Regions:
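N-terminal non-catalytic structural scaffold regions of very large proteins
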Residues: 1-210
Length: 210
């Protein structure tokens, strides 16, 4: 929420300094990003330690670098039968508008190239809830792979007729700062008003793309 409000301030009044920190909105954001970088390194270390403990308990979370041909063939068949029919691929070009990306949504994004050399952007929502996120891999240990890893690996099967130049998984975090008091109308039912506020928060500008 705080970062969202600072981004708004940076656009509207970028040279105004905060009376508590003595910093402009841009300077505060830079300080926050420096602190967040340290927190992210700490988060990654904690995650790796937790995954080691889970592995010691006989449960593994893997990607395609850690499986054999037999497991890879099974996952391809699983993708074709259980995931591919349920995904909704989007192609973005000059005539196709960029879609709205949901807050905290996970998306497989690819740069597509046609035979004539023209590029387009391909997007696939990966956590729509229509298929399980954890896919079990046949192995001696209890082994799983994330559905988004599966989608990204086989994404060329979805966008047939294109060459995949680059691909990645992204997640968008949207601004959660909204002034409810400024928007409140006494003639509205308060419950309906708050429902509208919550819906509006989900469509505010992005503050982070991972």
């Amino acid at each position: 929420v705080r970062v969202g409000s600072l981004i708004d301030q940076m656009i509207v009044s970028k040279n105004v300094k905060d009376n508590k920190t003595g910093m402009t909105a841009k300077e505060q954001i830079q300080a926050i990003l420096a602190r967040v970088a340290k927190l992210n390194r700490r988060k990654d270390t904690v995650y790796e330690n937790l995954m080691d403990e889970v592995a010691q308990a006989g449960i593994r979370l893997v990607d395609f670098r850690k499986i054999g041909k037999k497991e890879g063939k099974y996952l391809e068949q699983y993708f074709d039968a259980e995931i591919a029919p349920l995904i909704s691929p989007i192609v973005v070009g000059k005539r196709q508008p960029f879609p709205f990306l949901k807050n905290k949504g996970i998306y497989a994004v690819v740069v597509l190239e046609k035979k004539n050399g023209k590029e387009k952007l391909g997007i696939i929502p990966c956590n729509s809830g229509v298929f399980p996120r954890l896919v079990q891999v046949p192995a001696e240990e209890e082994t799983y792979m994330l559905a988004e890893e599966l989608i990204l690996h086989f994404i060329s099967k979805v966008f047939k007729g294109y060459f995949v130049k680059a691909k990645s998984l992204i997640r968008v975090t949207r601004n959660a700062d909204i002034d409810a008091d400024a928007l409140y109308d006494e003639d509205l039912d308060y419950r309906d008003f708050m429902e509208g506020i919550i819906k509006k928060r989900k469509r505010l500008l992005p503050v982070r793309v991972e």
